[in-house]
Amino acid sequence: MKKTPNRWLILAAAILTNLSLGAGYAWSVFQKALLETNASQGWVQAQTSLAFSISFAMVPVGMILFGPKVDSVGPKKFVFLGGILFGTGMFATGFANSLPVLYLTYGVVLGLGIGSAYGASTSVATKWFPDKKGLAGGLTAAGFGLGPLIIGPVAKSLIASMGIYSTFKVLGIVLLLVICTSSLVMAKAPTVAPTAGNAQPEGKTYKEVLRDGNYWLLWLI
């Protein structure tokens, strides 16, 4: 008989994944160091800020591309893929000595990684807790929010000791390993037949969510 995965371990892995992804939002720490390092090239805040804006925009794109396949393929592969993209984007930013490269690595690649991993990890956590969906969703969201608060100071310390570009490389490798390792325990949740006690309102499809104005309002907030 196949052993049922520990759902609390899966929830912990999802929280750790989202906390790691939250490093992408420690942009203020990274941007200051980038501007100081590339002052001779004439980089200004308006230019470097575009990298973060692109990353922010690519997150829902990643959700649109990968989200509809999570239920059929399973969350593990998309969290793993997200970890590869996120870590690679962060690591490659360590070589971004021009703005176009910065936009590609930190903007496009890293942003798509967040979209793939965050959507899958949050989804699997809530599906393993049909009786505590609010708790699971709240904890995974909190993990993401705590990411920049926890990793930001670490990044600042690394920047002071080794510089911004080496910091990107170190964080890229470490966070890739953390996210990809966490993905290994994210088994697909079993289908639970609804009863009078556990029946849940039918969820929306990704297309329906994207047509919902409330979704975009919450995302912008």
Residue ranges and their predicted role:
Residues 34, 107, 115-129, 136-137:
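Intracellular juxtamembrane helix-capping segments at the cytosolic ends
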Residues 187-204:
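Flexible cytoplasmic inter-helical loops of multi-pass small-molecule transporters
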Residues 139-189:
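Helix-loop-helix hairpin linking two adjacent transmembrane segments in secondary transporters
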Residues 28-61:
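Extracellular/periplasmic helix-loop-helix junction of adjacent transmembrane segments
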Residues 2-13, 98, 207-221:
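Juxtamembrane cytosolic amphipathic helices that cap and anchor the N-termini
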